[in-house]
């Protein structure tokens, strides 16, 4: 006698469901979406009136409504967090090998990841306060003026909260400044891409966004009633927006980084050992730090991806750095073109903080 199978439907998007995930019947795509959002502790910025339709065709368009529906049908954040806690405990055991390592400590940790997680959490909390981000915050589509204001303010926050974590006594202030200059813009672009995963929007630290399908709005100036420059600028730079999506954002969509992986890459961006005017002492420290970061990353992947090929995952993550470098090459070209067309000010927060 053959058992007749009945098709099951994902309670979130209506696609075919394979089993219960985190307490609700869902497809793998919605389960992975929910896990990423909870595990990554990402702020889900709302840009709608909570009435978006969530189905197989529209599920990627509004993360906030999709997340709300996950919770509504019974998915539990605690189910994700408990699983992560077990993996994180295995990770700490493999590094330290002592139960005492789980206890909070007032001393500075030797772990790159733990120090970065603490610093990034403080950065995110400060951003909420500075940019007035609350649970009821509704994201707004912004133009170049708003973007420049946000990034000029946020760069100061990044320097205060994140870069302090990277400082090493073996590196002079002059060399620290060199590393900082080469870090800032790649980090801005990388973090924006990370927070905009699976979206056609580019999210800013303020929660506002740039709609990459309507870049005329980004280049528009509401103070100028006869603003013809917006269309001209959009025509000039549209190919570069598309190229950025192909080189970095699409790559990040494929890799689907979690928060620790994002932070490991952030550290690798900073400790670059191939910069012009970098002295031998700085190069040596950067090489040592890169080796330590890769070692921690490898240990992390071994313990989080127990039944998967962790070495392949490490390779995927390292390749993200190549995508960031290609994007930076494109940004340098964009800067030159902006000077020719006299639209440098439309990207001044980016161009003004780039290394020459």
UniProtKB/Swiss-Prot annotation:
The keyword Manganese does not apply. Residues 7-82 bind DNA. Its main location: nucleus. It holds the Pfam family zf-C4. The keyword rRNA processing does not apply. GO terms for molecular function: DNA-binding transcription factor activity; sequence-specific DNA binding; zinc ion binding. InterPro entries: NHR-like_dom_sf, Nucl_hrmn_rcpt_lig-bd, Znf_hrmn_rcpt, Znf_NHR/GATA. GO terms for biological process: regulation of transcription by RNA polymerase II. It is found in: Nucleus. Residues 108-356 form the NR LBD domain. GO terms for cellular component: nucleus. A zinc finger (NR C4-type) spans 10-30, 48-70. Orphan nuclear receptor. Belongs to the nuclear hormone receptor family. This is Nuclear hormone receptor family member nhr-42. It comes from Caenorhabditis elegans.
């Amino acid at each position: 006698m053959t058992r007749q199978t009945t098709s099951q439907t994902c309670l979130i998007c209506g696609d075919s469901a394979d089993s219960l995930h985190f307490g609700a019947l869902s497809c793998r795509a919605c389960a992975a979406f929910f896990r990423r959002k909870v595990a990554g502790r990402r702020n889900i910025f709302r840009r709608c009136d909570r009435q978006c339709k969530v189905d197989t065709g529209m599920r990627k368009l509004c993360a906030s409504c999709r997340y709300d529906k996950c919770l509504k049908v019974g998915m539990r954040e605690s189910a994700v967090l408990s699983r992560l806690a077990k993996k994180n405990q295995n990770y700490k055991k493999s590094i330290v090998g002592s139960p005492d390592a789980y206890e909070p400590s007032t001393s500075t940790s030797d772990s790159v990841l733990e120090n970065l997680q603490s610093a990034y959490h403080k950065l995110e909390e400060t951003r909420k306060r500075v940019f007035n981000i609350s649970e009821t915050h509704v994201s707004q589509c912004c133009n170049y003026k708003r973007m420049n204001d946000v990034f000029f303010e946020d760069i100061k926050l990044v320097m205060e909260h994140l870069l302090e974590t990277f400082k090493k006594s073996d590196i002079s202030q002059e060399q620290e400044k060199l590393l900082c200059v080469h870090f800032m813009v790649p980090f801005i672009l990388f973090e924006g891409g990370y927070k905009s995963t699976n979206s056609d929007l580019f999210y800013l630290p303020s929660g506002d966004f740039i709609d990459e399908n309507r870049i005329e709005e980004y280049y528009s100036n509401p103070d100028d009633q006869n603003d013809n420059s917006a269309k001209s600028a959009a025509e000039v730079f549209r190919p570069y927006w598309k190229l950025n999506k192909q080189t970095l954002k699409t790559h990040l969509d494929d890799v689907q980084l979690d928060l620790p992986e994002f932070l490991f890459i952030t550290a690798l961006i900073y400790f670059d050992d191939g910069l012009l005017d970098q002295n031998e002492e700085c190069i040596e420290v950067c090489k040592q730090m890169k080796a330590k970061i890769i070692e921690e990353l490898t240990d992390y992947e071994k313990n989080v991806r127990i039944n998967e090929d962790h070495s392949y995952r490490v390779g995927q993550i390292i390749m993200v750095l190549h995508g960031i470098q290609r994007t930076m090459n494109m940004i340098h070209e964009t800067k030159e073109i902006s000077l020719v067309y006299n639209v440098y000010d439309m990207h001044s927060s980016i161009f003004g903080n780039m290394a020459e």
